[in-house]
Amino acid sequence: MCCDPPAADRLPPQVAAMHESYLALAAERPADWGGESDAYAAGQPYGRWLGVRLLAAVFSLQAGDWPATVRSCLTEPLPAGLVVASLDDGGLRLRAGPAPYVLEGGSVEVAVLLDSHLEQATRLEVDGTSVPVPAGGVELVTRAVTGAGPLPVGGADAPAAQPAARARLRLRAAAPSRWSVTDDRGGAWFPAGCLPRWDFHDRPLFHGNDLELEVPAVPLTVTCTRGMEFATAETTVTPSAGDSAEVELEPARLYETAARGWYGGDLHVHMNYSGDQVCGPDDAARMQLGEGLHLMTLVAGNIGRTRVYDREAFEATAGHDLAWTTGERVARFSVEFRNDLLGHFHGLGLTGRPARYHSGHDGSDEPHDWPPNADACREFRRLGATVGYTHPVFSPLSDGTPAQAFAVPRSVEARELVADAALGLVDSVDLIGPSDVEGTAVLYHHLLSCGLRLAATAGTDVWLSYSRGPLFSNPPGWGRVYADLRGTPLSVAAFADAVRAGRTQATNGPFLELLVDGRGPGDRIEATPGRRLPVTVGCQGLGVERLELVGPDGVLAATDAGGGAAPAIDAEVEAGESMWLCAVARGPGHPSVLGPVVFAHTSPVWVELHGRPLRRPASARWLLDWLDRFEAMLGQHGRFADDGQRAEVVGVIEQARRRYREFC
């Protein structure tokens, strides 16, 4: 049935004990198991009702204006089951979303959001309980209701629930898939034992095949997909009371990469990362299968204290494939090394326990911004892993300088990436993930233009233990790095070799094909000055509006999609000097893409003239500006035990400066 609970008896003892401890922590402190993230703890219950508005709410909470942000999210239509009770000098006003369905003999959760515009604290009675509300503040109250009776709120009656007869629904596809079942009031329905989760577009989702679930005997919408290589199949069904209805769907394939030797992976997935539910290995396996994801790296990582989530699972399995690995898919545990000032990076193929899992978190066992990330990069390399910096920047870097990447000190942006890449310690940069794709591309292009051979990769940073994110509760693999294995069977080692060689592309939907004189990403072409190189770029997938061929001097060729045909470029590029060439696809938001925009970017094909190195002085100066700002930020915000520690990190920056100055 694909929705059995995690089989603890098949887990290594330390992993089973870890899972049990997380269940206890989640019961004791939902959404913030370690007592280390007030923003997530406060925001998570609201996100259950505000859906995709959660991200804005969390950012506003960090800015200290939580009530105003919550109010900005209360636009019509309100979701089913949410009642907003507004208090001001004129009294109490209620407005509500549709009453949710409640199955006969069951219960359903509803919420009352108390929104006070009074200048003094007050109390309001909700379903017989007096609830304190701060002056000018908001308070969320939830209740489990069993019937249609009204919900008393401050002497008024709010709608509670609509009773509905029980029915059963059976779901089948040709393979494990991602499903969604919603009723005509927007309510979501899940099989017992499956973790309830919602994607970026606030659509409920679960994974499996041949599934059964209890549903109301009302009109239902069912969708089925299998990750970005597939379209979405949809149907409606109205099961009869007491009966069982069967739905069989098969999503159409948009493109197939494995047949061409390209395999898709997600290098940055958190199985457990605090949250409102606990994810077990079986849950993670179902998600990988249902997304058609060839490779998945589950990373252990801390948040802000000493606890490293999923550390026991990593240490019990380090260097070994997980139990559900086959010839068509592979999964491993690894580590995300985290310093919020210097940056975060992940390692694909890590074979052993590193000396440190994190640094620079005040209140943890590693409070100082030392040693430099460069030391951890070297250790990951010694332990067999690739090094990939993740979520590099959160702004578009649109002003021509790197200033926006230094606006917030501990923003988890990849400040040390520029130094570590110059020292040859980095293999890849995540162009897809919870970061700004345009700003990341700006940074990536400057690095390439200094001859740094970095692969384009993807690490989504999804948290499987969160029901709503919105990006963080997306399914794993919503963004992927596709690696050209050149006929080698799928394995972690083969995938890592492709990353090191730059035979990759990063995407959240479209699949790109780039050939320069018959050579693909990662390849090197020896050319003579003036030679004209034929270039073809193809693109498959949904939502692309513009296709570009780019190099160190900008856009070399472009086409806009139109007329229903797949966009393509057929051009010639003159080899005037050594260069890199990449293909890029862009588009606005699209229902099939689980992010704000459509984006794909290949790693480069390298064109070398008589072995001369690639040099673009303007990019070197831009990266030197980055390093200057990084050093200034260390001086102002770095935490060090002594001047020697600070000098060691600054020494890494100075080594990188010498490299970039060679190009000016």
Residue ranges of each PLM-predicted region?
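An acidic-aromatic substrate-binding cleft motif
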Residues: 162-163, 236, 245-299, 615-631
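Glycine-centered loop/turn motifs
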Residues: 105, 242, 333-335, 365, ...
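Asp/Glu-centered strand-loop micro-motifs enriched in Gly/Pro and often flanked by an aromatic residue
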Residues: 99-101, 207, 212, 268
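Charged catalytic cores and adjacent phosphate/nucleic-acid-binding surfaces used
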Residues: 2-92, 111-204, 211-215, 225, ...
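Beta-sheet-dominated interaction scaffolds and their linkers
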Residues: 89-111
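Catalytic cores of extracellular degradative/oxidative enzymes
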Residues: 262-456, 460, 465-468, 491
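A short tyrosine-centered beta-strand micro-motif
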Residues: 218-222
